[in-house]
Amino acid sequence: MRRVFACVCVLGCLSTSAQEARKPAPRDPGPDSQYRLGPDSMPQEGVPKGEIKGPFTLPSQAYPGTQHTYWVYVPAQYDPAVPAALMVFQDGQAFKNETGDMRAQNVMDNLIYRREIPVMIGVFINPGRRPDQPEPTPRNWGDRDTNRPTEYNTLDDRYARVVTEELMPALAKDYNISKDPEMHGIGGSSSGAIAAFTVAWERPDHFRKVLSNVGSFVNLRGGHVYPEKVLAAEKKPIRVYLCDGRNDNRGMRNGRYDETRDWFLQNVRLMKALQQKGYDVNYAWGMNNHGQKFGGAILPDMMRWLWRDGPVSTDPNDAVERDFRRPAVKKD
């Protein structure tokens, strides 16, 4: 009887071992698996919601034959009598996507309400396209069928002209936006990030805050030379937050390594050049791939840091300062 029992146990163990062997090996967590949006990126009960207006179409003089689609975020606290700050996001469709990784409108709603950033007009602008080309979407950002590569990756002032000479005058017709360049920020992801940096680099008299997520400071159209440009040029009055990941595109092409196309390396190089030159620069290096998971998770912190020096009252009797920002009173 003991022998029979022993045989049964052995067979049972063998059967269990065979079943375990057939199970797929546990998958390693992906580089983006640890990043989640926090409460600052979600709609919160009691927080006034801003309004997104648009889409609007802006014909371009800088790139004849093309047009830019954009949307305008107007916070509930916007008062036309008070000049507002300005934040411009490239690849606007991705930054305003309600189910995407950034959800910038929610971030602005929450941080404005808590006085952690100033009241600001937000702009979500897409790359230019001809009228016969498709509008970029969260699935197709337009690299193959719009003017995105030319506008965003080229190191010249043409896209800066779109923002400063075409977009900003259009906004000024409808909104009271501060003329102080310290109150103007610009940001983006990937090629949209280097585009944002280039706008501030070319026009620091208009933009002085740059938000860069997985910025394409690589040799797509010469962006890898920015560290050398920073070191060679006179220091400019801009503040920069760089965000990238160790698993971004790392420069392997056809089995060969090309450091000029290593996103992470080139972001680190730019950070070091900015530090060496004495710029006001902050940075965060994650584990992320080339995308917006990490950038979206820390977007509230990036915005707080960029806009940290807004005016503040220290009067203990200032009841307004010690209260949340309430919606502006609508005037008839």
Residue ranges and their predicted role:
Residues 1-4:
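Positively charged n-region of N-terminal signal peptides that target proteins for export
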Residues 6-13:
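Bacterial N-terminal signal peptides
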Residues 14-18:
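Sec/Tat signal peptide C-region and signal peptidase I cleavage site
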Residues 19-332:
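Non-catalytic cap/lid and distal C-terminal segments of serine-dependent acyl enzymes
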